């Protein structure tokens, strides 16, 4: 059982390739509770504070402060599968209307 849900913005611990250190970055949980059942992984979309350009699949978060983010941010079209133990904590939740917009961007990116 996970302590996070679809639409949650979480802090993820990414280990450097040389395994000499790690950095924490935010991500948006996009997988469902059903997906999480019996798995040790979750699917998330990366979040960046580099808002200088929007690429296909990117969505600029309007309620970034309310979501617990420190800076204006973009949910990117970069989707990753990570182990549950990489999630360092929950920062907040993306409002339903914005999650719907992200879903539309993912559909566009993945031709779903």
Regions found by a protein language model. Name each.
Residues 20-24, 29-63:
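Compact nucleic-acid interaction/catalytic patches
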Residues 15-19:
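Short, charged beta-turn/beta-strand-edge "cap" motif at the junction between a beta-strand
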Residues 1-3, 21:
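Short, surface-exposed secondary-structure edge patches
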